[in-house]
Amino acid sequence: MRHLHHQTSQIKLWAVIPAAGSGSRFSKTELKQYQYIQDATVIEHTVKRLSQLPLTGYVLAIGKQDTFASTLSFQDKHKAHFCNGGVERVHSVLNALNYLSQIAEEDDWVLVHDAARPCVTFECLNTLVKNAIETNQSAILAIPVRDTLKQVNQEQQIDKTVSRELLWQAQTPQIAKIGILKKAIETALKNNLTITDEASALESIGESVQVVMGRSDNIKITYPDDLELARLILQSQN
C-alpha cells in the first residue's frame, strides 16, 4: 500500500464492483459472489484485496432486491457505498459511475473489478494503478494467451489456427478516469455497441488503453467448481 501513497496523496482512487449479476451458471438461489470460501463470502475477499490500495471509497452495484450485501463485514466498511445494479454488467458499472459523479471528481481514477475475482494480488493492483497514474492512461490487467487457439466453423470443424502472438486475455481490475469511462460507456450504449468490459467501451471512443501484466491465478469464479480452485489459490497466497 505504501508504494502508492506518495503518488496518490493528491490523487483520489475509487473502486466499482458490479455485483448485481444473476450468476446464471450457479443455481438460481445462489449468487457466486455470496458463496463462502472459509469464513467469508467471495465478495468480502474481493473487497479486502482492493482495500489494500489507498481507496477513497468503493461502490458496490447490487441487485434491487439484494438485502444481503449490506449485512456483510466488508473491509473499511465506512468507505462502502451501494447503488442499484442494472440488467447487464455494463449498466451496473454506469449506475455506479453516475453515483460516483455526485461525490467524486471527473479526473479521479476508478478501478472496475469483478466481484467474483477474489484472488487478485496486491502486487498486480499496485503495478496497475502506478502505471495508469504515471502514464496518465487507462489500463487493464491482462495475461498473454498461452494456449493454441483454433477458429472453427458451425460444424465444429477447425477452419484455421489463430496466431496468439499479439493476443492477451483481459482481466480486471480495469482503471480509467471517472469522466472518460462514463462518457465511453454512455456513447457505446447510445450506439448499441456490445460492451464486454470497460476497455471495449474506451476503445470504441478512441481512448488508448494499455495492458499491464497480470497473473494466471487472478481467476474469475464462473462455475461451482471454481470455488475450490479459488480457495486453494487464496490458501497458497496467504
Curated annotation (Swiss-Prot):
| Leading EC class | transferase
Is NADP found in the keyword set?
no
* GO-annotated molecular function: 2-C-methyl-D-erythritol 4-phosphate cytidylyltransferase activity
The reaction(s) catalysed by this protein are:
2-C-methyl-D-erythritol 4-phosphate + CTP + H(+) = 4-CDP-2-C-methyl-D-erythritol + diphosphate
**CDD domains given for it?**
CDP-ME_synthetase (cd02516)
Pathway entry: Isoprenoid biosynthesis; isopentenyl diphosphate biosynthesis via DXP pathway; isopentenyl diphosphate from 1-deoxy-D-xylulose 5-phosphate: step 2/6
One Pfam family from the record: IspD
Domain of life, source organism: Bacteria
Q: Which UniProt keywords apply?
A: Isoprene biosynthesis, Nucleotidyltransferase, Transferase
Q: Which PROSITE patterns match?
A: ISPD (PS01295)
The UniProt site entry described as Transition state stabilizer is assigned to 25, 32
Write down the position(s) of the site called Positions MEP for the nucleophilic attack: 164, 220
EC number(s) of the enzyme?
2.7.7.60
Q: Which PANTHER family match?
A: 2-C-METHYL-D-ERYTHRITOL 4-PHOSPHATE CYTIDYLYLTRANSFERASE, CHLOROPLASTIC
**What's its job?**
Catalyzes the formation of 4-diphosphocytidyl-2-C-methyl-D-erythritol from CTP and 2-C-methyl-D-erythritol 4-phosphate (MEP).
The record's similarity note reads:
Belongs to the IspD/TarI cytidylyltransferase family. IspD subfamily.
Q: Which NCBIfam families match?
A: ispD
- Write down what this protein is called: 2-C-methyl-D-erythritol 4-phosphate cytidylyltransferase
Q: Which organism is it from?
A: Acinetobacter baumannii (strain ATCC 17978 / DSM 105126 / CIP 53.77 / LMG 1025 / NCDC KC755 / 5377)
